[in-house]
Amino acid sequence: MYLPIFTTHSLSEGNPQVTRGLIIVHGANRNADDYFKRGFQAAAAVGHQEATVVVAPHFQTSSDNPASDELFWSSSGWKRGHLSSTEGPRPRRSSYSAIDQIIDLLSDPSHFPALTEITMTGHSAGGQVAHRYAATSRAEKNLGPVTMRYVVANPSTYLYIRQERENTGAFVVPDASVCSDYDDWHYGLSERNTYAGALVVDTIKAQLVRRDVRILIGDADSLSASLDVSCGANLQGPYRFSRGRRLMRFMDQFFPEHSHKEMVVPNVGHSSSGMYLSAIGLDALFGT
């Protein structure tokens, strides 16, 4: 690997007893160690700690003082799948390609022969990663019999795969003269970066529609702390819970065959532990 990871098992050596992989992505604070603990706590809460390999990648920025051989990203770039910094090692890599590599290792039967399912999740900024990665990942084509799900928890924004946004109860195309970049990557599919741009739009749409995506939102997540309030973000709704509900209405209207599932955690706000360790959160991660 070309970035630090926290993991319960060696990915290169594997483990014949492991049946499930849980990849958990940190938020804007990049506290991968805390998210690693959250993932392990969640697995233990349902009695799966022995059979689950928990992996928490650490997407570093320059402020993390990365080692000379470790890639790092801008504070927004890692969330969006951008290439690593030009000031770091070469070749530059997308943050999303790091997740591809983790999935490739987990799904390799010579490493984890009993593994049958991988869950990729993130909360807040990590939730942004999870939703956009679900749309653009190429790793699923190499999974064989291993199934994949994505749990998107309380992100600030989502990826929209059409130009319409909800306005006063109806989906319309916004006035681009007022918000010219509202449909650019990472809000939409225009001006995609290197990783997302390697796929044509129709492929991205098809992947996001058919993949198993759980939209995990806390109904008390209505504050503006660390919320993206750019015009492109505000066109998705006033706060995180509202934005999640709108995204689901968007998918229902334009892609009724979608495989997104809305899962609302009552009385929980912007808390990764509150979300993941709730009954609904555990079901999103480990249920059917």
Predicted regions and their residues:
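C-terminal catalytic histidine-bearing segment of alpha/beta-hydrolase fold enzymes
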Residues: 216, 228-229, 245-288
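A short loop-to-beta-strand scaffold at the N-terminal edge of the catalytic core in hydrolase folds
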Residues: 1-13, 20-21, 98
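Conserved acidic catalytic loop of the alpha/beta-hydrolase fold
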Residues: 13, 97-116
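Conserved hydrolase catalytic core segment
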Residues: 132-148
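Gly/Ala-rich beta-loop-alpha elbow adjacent to hydrolase catalytic centers
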Residues: 122-126, 130
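The feature captures the conserved acid-bearing segment of alpha/beta-hydrolase catalytic domains
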Residues: 145-253
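Active-site machinery of serine-nucleophile hydrolases
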Residues: 28-105, 147-156, 161, 248-256, ...
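Short beta-strand element of the alpha/beta-hydrolase
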Residues: 16-28
